[in-house]
Amino acid sequence: MSKTRHLFGTDGIRGLANQDPMTVEIAQKLGQAAGLRFTRGVHRHRVLLGKDTRLSGYMIECALVSGFLSAGMDVTLVGPMPTPAIAMLTRSLRADLGVMISASHNPFGDNGIKLFGPDGFKLSDETEAEIEELMRSDLAGRLAAPDRIGRASRLNDAAGRYIENAKASFPRGRRLDGLRIVIDCANGAAYRVAPTALWELGAEVIRIGCEPDGININEQCGSTKPESLCEAVVAHGAHIGIALDGDADRVLIADEKGRLIDGDQILALIARSWGRQGRLNSAQIVATVMSNMGLARCLEGLGLELVRTAVGDRYVVERMRELGANLGGEQSGHMVLSDFATTGDGLVAALQVLAVLVEEGRPASEVCRMFTPFPQMLRNVRFTGKSPLHAPSVQDARRRAEAELGTAGRLLLRESGTEPLVRVMAEAEDPALVERIVAEMCEAIDSAQVVA
């Protein structure tokens, strides 16, 4: 019988800091349980631990460290560092486990914990369930003897290691001389490494969202609030703008006119570039159910096939591994380039876009506009208690909407994996139809809550 997860969601454990499940007590117990799960044999075991710039990161970090040490694991601390850097360093240092303390694009009051195996990939649902089962048990008799308690140390060159790894994804012999780039690091984990990597490659770098104070992460900046980036690109006469999120596993682009370029366009651009160079391992490009139908048509024109998964970069990665594909991503900006990373890496993806810009010598507004997207609308409906998604009235409304859209459009209803929200998305060539269907579905979901 398979074990079930209660704490872990689609991207680790996440919640409001100092409230269940993001408490000191749970973080410490998680450290103990994960430490025991990944301690095999009598040799010293090590966990690599990083975080973003949230104030609560100090608290969660200390709790996790105490848990891991009590389980007999040595802890290597790297401080604020992008999520993909933690995955990369876990592999590079031959650590038994990697941990990232971050709530990604969420507000500063939230925090989260993501776990990576020794191969740098996020843990499977089954392994997370095993850790939860250990957390629910009495671990007192299984913790380390006094002479086997772990030690904590700090890795001082973590930033430099990640910067060099990211730069290695940029074509050898090419530079960014003459390019003026605005980089928005969301006051998050990449505030030092991303601007430095671009500068070392020769770009003129204009920084915004690079002054974290513990509470301003993702605040009116970064990939979830790209308006400041778009304005800065125009104001500074920049060639391109790059927006990362709080843990730098997402990226969005602004062209020289200050217009936003989403993950679907970025994915199509990299697919075309890599396809021309013979660098694609597969004719299948992996994206999620949120990706625009225009992306599918664009890839078809390139002789490629779009394969869809559930939302979440972990599911994109899993499908890529099954297919042997080396390129996948999400409309939200998660770009997985498995030649260079085991998870979404915003900086590495941005460097692929910049490589095309340098190669073609054309403006970003021309290079990055790969297709005209279908009109698409996404709305979130917050709920309390039980999800209204499976209510008969909602299902009836869904069937009517899908019949009306036919094969010329799509309707997607899904529950968020991190918040009590139902996401309603529709797309079709007729924008008025899209707007009406989304409005009707949102009304049906709201009405179902009232009835319940």
UniProtKB/Swiss-Prot annotation:
GO biological process terms, semicolon-separated: carbohydrate metabolic process; peptidoglycan biosynthetic process; UDP-N-acetylglucosamine biosynthetic process
Residues involved in Mg(2+) binding: 104, 245, 247, 249
Keyword Metal-binding: yes
Any Pfam family the entry gives: PGM_PMM_II
Purpose: Catalyzes the conversion of glucosamine-6-phosphate to glucosamine-1-phosphate.
Annotated family: Belongs to the phosphohexose mutase family.
Name of the protein in its database record: Phosphoglucosamine mutase
